[in-house]
Amino acid sequence: MMILGRRMLKIGLAVLLISSSTTAEELMKDNFESQPETRWSYFSDQVMGGISQGRVTFGSQDGESFAHMTGQVSTENNGGFIQLRRVIAKNSVDSAAGVYIKVRGNGQQYYLHLRTAGTLLPWQYYQASFASTSDWQTVRVPLSDFVRSGNWLSKAIRASSIRSIGIVAYGRDHSADLQIAEIGFY
């Protein structure tokens, strides 16, 4: 009986180790279910004197949960952005090759911003653009397509250094209207 108990304990520990290592290798993804407002923050150029207006709401339609970012982006007063951002847990995207996002919108161009351990100043980020359509689409962007915001940053992003991801309406006067059903790393 004692030998059987030890064998079961060893098997149980092996299963725990295998499942925890598998879980550690899963990459971050968010489908905006289960209190997304605790993971995502909205802010605009008003933090630096700009006058862009916007908001983010979380909802669902036809069984699909999503974040909905709307607003007016204005470049007056050296502004020009509204943004939805999420902090990325350390080591949760170490093996990532890129970012994917399931979106629909108003036909405008939007941006993904990644901040890393090396983006120390508020205006530093890595950026990639995508166009929205009125139908749901999944856009995949390799990390190699992200462009640094300045020469002080490394040319290439190391996945293990990623600290946050942002979805941004940026850079020109326009109306923003974007729904995001899922975002993650691949």
Where are these regions (language model features)?
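Beta-rich carbohydrate-recognition modules and glycan-binding surfaces
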Residues: 22-186
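Bacterial N-terminal signal peptides
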Residues: 10-20
